[in-house]
Amino acid sequence: MITTLISFSIVSIICIGCIGIINSNNEIIDINYKSTVVKYKLKGGLELVYSKVLEEVNNTIEKSKISENPQSYFKNYFLIDNKNNFIYKIENINLDDLEVYVVNNKVYMENNHIRFDITCNNKTNNIKKSYKSSFKIKTDFDFNNNTDLNEIVIKYNSQEI
């Protein structure tokens, strides 16, 4: 009788341990799933920013074509005249729980490219992630030739921070 009780106790302890391990494993899988969902939301947000930048560049190219000096108009549009409006349009992309920022509100010129960095933040179910991506817009292209927008606007250095 005592051996039966001891055997039953050992089996019960092993079962309780297994239940604890299964529960922990399920929690880890759930956290991993939620983390992956947040990651893809952020990547989707960066793609929305990219499409918004393409749209702005396309509109600016059309406006630049009717100006006397298209290249100067194009540069000034992003760097001086509509810089704040451009930043505002990027940061106001509405996606649930997604925050988009132009890093330091800085849009600058470097090596014939207009450059800026974007940070996307998301916090869902106590999981917080951020992604950063850099963008550059070429300024030395032929305005009269139909250049592919994907060659003018380049997204690079996308990484989790």
Question: What does each model-found stretch correspond to?
Answer:
Residues 2-41:
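Aliphatic-rich helix starts adjacent to a transmembrane/signal segment
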Residues 47-161:
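Conserved functional hotspots that engage anionic ligands or polymers and/or phospholipid headgroups
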